[in-house]
Structures are given as structure tokens and as C-alpha cells.
């Protein structure tokens, strides 16, 4: 989300510049003036009653004018304009509802690593800490008149295809990992699980099955994602189920694409039957926004309905409450006159929106709201700086090391490549200006190194004009660092990749550097992976790190790893596929399981990876032992009966305990990844393995051990039937820890008859008469 369809981009530009023009208070005056006479200002009433009072006082024109992301308010009532569109993917981000000052207060915010790198840390507590800081800074910007209270983050679509331009915005490819990430992120952003008074509103996007931008001429605006109930339930929806049902996020964004023939923002089954009814997401102040231009796409790109009036009605009737675009304000009056929706449907949408603002304290006296006291002094604090650094260090993954790292001494280092002196490139997308960005060169100097710098080549250049200078710099150095990979000229919103090789002639330059027989370290940046086969095979490349988009702390964090100040412990949150993979399956094929024209997707269904999901090396060695070799036995009846009022799939199946021992010489964190395999259990085909739990053990000293407890939910042991039902099957199961290690395994059995834990609502079928679906 952010790039609009062409019809709406001038509108977005106007909104952006008008938002920069004012830093007045965003809050209404409930003490004097006309709004004080409305019960929306009566703090003794519940949020819904207060919102109903406000909506009841609006004229039809005022109602319609407030269904748009930059709502005009109602001056007659004393209701100010409000911008619902604010961004904070990895820190408060510039544009639309958010404005940064040119200097001084509110001219910067903390910039954390992009979610793909934060996801590589596999640290749920860290995710919550990062989200807590982001929400505090977001609230400070709102209180200072520089932003709204609603933030359209996080992106929790799983990173299914390595070519996806927006994979960098997600924590990875695994649905359990995404689900735990979003639970803790929403907890930190909203300040609790379903709080009566959220600090800010988070928005889980893009609902659903959205992971294509523009591939081979197929654009997201018109793409129809054809997904089976099994893949939908098992892979594309779990993170959204956790976000809404369990974490109780206050907002959801429907996506550009169609799902099985129906645009998601016009899909009543998706937004009403599944989201609100089946997942129980009907609490006060929960609302749905369309992605920016998505309601326009219903008729202009998907051709699902005949015109704008039918598109507006289709979206409103399906359960979309807010339009990030102009279709609602332009066509809702005409649609009402045609009888395409009723007035109460419009009222309900506005009540959901304004009851959310009531919960946020938008209409309350500042003295009654603890979050209203958050100010500029809580932005970019020393603790936030340290957390950004820590988050970056925790996520960096070591992919190769022949003993070159950690660096043994100072001396002269040649830093070469397009990321050698990069600044904003390190941030990825949806970024705001930080106070500083630490480059690799800055970090080298501050670690006592003499630096020889030469860029050598660009990200996607085929010119070798800079090679000679780079080779000369390398010859004068004791150690060579090549910093390259991909950036947002290669992968971004609106742009997928067509290949997953290193772009341009970067590998040619690395090859020539490797011939110098100097210690050579390659630091790979970018959200998506590239095929590292040649680097892994090249004996002249001593070490290889993946650093994602590390943001403000980037160079400093990388040098902490290079010098051994910190030990690498991150794990790949995605599969690194061979370059040939893109020739085997089109991006448009949404199927996960292997077939005649699909080699399979993600580590669960594909086993020919260059580097597998969960891979990551250390400066030390570890041993893992089970505290029990066998667990159970378990019975489907007792397991499926549940012990609390929580959904049974979230209940604890068991806690599996292991002992992790540092058998090397360097203190280090260790991420315990727990995978489940089963012997012909459930429907065919059978997954290679499934992540069912993880935990990051911190600071294990040489020779020391830590007990690690891995909680596994009932839903993690279950499998998904072809109709989408979540089913617990009897059978024999095996547990293994880590990737590519020969650690002992544990086993357990489940007896009894198969038990359905969750009946997946039957998806509606695409109707051929879609144009008339929303008629009288």
C-alpha cells in the first residue's frame, strides 16, 4: 500500500502537501463551541453511544464526506478534518497524515530495521519492545499535530515468492512465525491486547492473499489470486486470524487483488462471514479500510461491477468502512439514490470509525488521557537508539565463515560496493528521517580502522569502469569488505523481480576481489534473497553476512558482528532459492504444494534450497539435548476438549524442554527452532516439516547451558484438510531442533479419532452476474 492507481495519485500528492502545511492540534474542542453540545463529548457514555450521537447529527453530505481517508470533518458541528492514513512500518514514516519539521522538534524519529531483518531475530519480546517505542513516538507526533492516531501497519502477508517486491515489509515466509510476530507487534503498538484505551490503532494488511506487485505485465490492481480453501486456511490467513481474533487489532486493510474472482474489498464472505463472524472481530471500534485505490479497482480494473456507484455499494455492503481513494465520496450519494445500499449500512461504517476515535481519547479532555502527555522528549531517546541497534544486531545472519570472522585486528580495510557508503538505501521503504544513519565507512573509522573506499559498481550496472579503482583500493588494504546486494531500485512496492540473481556485474567484481587472496567478506543487503551459490562455493570469499535493510544503526551493527563485539545468531526467515526457481513456477501460481508445474513453495514443500529457512551460523558451536526423549501419549479427545475459553487451536498442546550447551569459545545467543514431522498423518501430500515453536536463548557463555522451553499450540500440531478445516489427526510425530544439525530428536504419538478443531466457512463462489449482485 501507498502507490495509488493513476486516477488517485494527484489526490494523494495534494493530501501530502496539505498535511505538511499545518501542525495544529488534530484534536477537536469538546469544551466550547458546537461539538460540546453533542454526546460524543460525554465521557460518561460508552464509545458506541458517543459515536452514534455524532453520526446522528450529520447530514448525508457530511456522512459521505467522512468516508474518505482524509475526512473533511463537519465544520457545522465543530468536527475537525482528520487523516486516517499514517504509516509506521519500522518507525514513524513520512507522508500523508504524517509530517516532519524541517529542523528541530519532530524533524526525525527512530528508524528500526525493516521487518524482514527484525523477523530474522526470532525474538518475540524484541518485536514488542520495538512496537512499543514506535507507538510512543507515533503518539508524540499526533499530540504535536504532526500525525493522526491510526497507523496502517503491519504488513503480514507471508513472503510466498522470492520475487515479491514487498517481501521486505514482512517478517518472513512461515505462518506461525508471522502469527507470533504480529501478535507481539500489535500488543506493543496498541499497548495491550484489546485495550479499552489503545495508544494508537494498528492496521493489519493486506487482507488477503496479496503478494504480487507488477510481474510480467500483470499488475496487483487487476490480479485475481486463485487460492484453494486448503492453502487459504493453512497459509494465507493464519497471521490475519491471529491479528484480529487473538491480538484484537482495531483495523484491517483489504487488498487490491481479487480472491477467487471477487475483489477483496467487495468480498462479503471475507470481510463479514470470515473476519467479523467466524473470527469474532466485532468488538467496538473495529473497522476496515480499503487499500489506496482498491475500491476504484473493483470496477476500473477487476470489472467486477459496472461503475463507481456499484463499486462503492459493493464495498460498503461487504463491510469496507473507509475508502483510501475517492469512490466513496464521489459515488455513495448516487448509489443510495439507486437503492444499492441502505442508510443504516453507511451509519454503521461511520459508527465503527468514530467509536475507534472515541476509544483513542480523541474527543476527551487532555488531562483525562495519559497518552496525551507524550511529547517530543520521548522521541529518539537513548533507550530507543540502543533498541534500534540491538534489533539490527540480533537480525543479522551469517551465511558463511571460514574463520575470517571475527576480524582479528585493526589495520586498513577496503570497503567496496554500492552499499559501502549507503545512507537512506539502508532504510528500505516506508521510512521516516532518523537523526542519523551509520554507514559502514563511519563504523569502520569509529572502530579504529583506516579505510580505503571505492564504490566499484552500482547495484544494477554492467559498466566495469570502476573496477580498477576498487581493485587498487583492495590491494592497499589488509581486509576487503564488499557491500552490495539489492535495494529499492530492484525490489519495492509496485515492482517485483523477474530474476533472483545478484543484479548487474556485482558478482564479477566480487570474483576479481576474491582473486587477490586477501581476507574478503561480503555483506549482502536487501529484503529478498539472491542466489548465493557462487559465493558459497568461492574459496576466496571468506565470509558472507546478510544484513537486510538495517536502517539507522546499519553500519555500526554490521561492524559489531564483523569485529566480534556481538556474535551473530540471526536465522534466515525465508528460503534462499536457486536462480533457476523462477523458471519453474510463475508468480501468479498461488499453490503451495508441489505439482506437475510447481516445484513447491517455502521450506514446507520445497527441498532444493541454496540455503534453507532457519539457516544461520555462529562464532561458536552448540549442542542440544532433550530433557525427555518421548512425550505423551496424547489423545485427540482430551487435546481437542480445551481447558480455557480461548480458541482450542491456541491452547497449549505441550511444553517441550531442551538443554542448549555452548560447546565453543564465544558467548552467543542461540535460536531454537522446533520443527514437527509426521509419518503419513493427514491429507497427502505431506509437508517436509513444519515450524511449531521457537525461542531465542540469550548470552550463553562458553561451557554453560540454558534450559529452553518451547510451547507448542494444539493448532500447530493439527493439519489443514482440503476444505480448509483445521484437523487434529492421530499418528506418530517427531520433533527436531535447528536446521542442518544432527541433534537428537524426540517423538510422541496421538491416539483416537481425527478431530476438527475449526470448521472453515465455505467460501462463496464467484458469480457470473457480478455486475447486478449489489442491485436492488
UniProtKB/Swiss-Prot annotation:
Residues 1-23 form the signal peptide. One of its GO terms (cellular component) is extracellular region. GO terms for molecular function: alpha-L-arabinofuranosidase activity; xylan 1,4-beta-xylosidase activity. It catalyses: Hydrolysis of (1->4)-beta-D-xylans, to remove successive D-xylose residues from the non-reducing termini. Glycans are attached at residues 65, 105, 343, 410, 421, 462, 623, 766. Its EC number is 3.2.1.37. It is an enzyme of class 3 (hydrolase). The keyword Secreted applies. Xylan 1,4-beta-xylosidase involved in the hydrolysis of xylan, a major structural heterogeneous polysaccharide found in plant biomass representing the second most abundant polysaccharide in the biosphere, after cellulose. This is Probable exo-1,4-beta-xylosidase bxlB. It comes from Aspergillus flavus (strain ATCC 200026 / FGSC A1120 / IAM 13836 / NRRL 3357 / JCM 12722 / SRRC 167). The lineage of its organism: Eukaryota, Fungi, Dikarya, Ascomycota, Pezizomycotina.
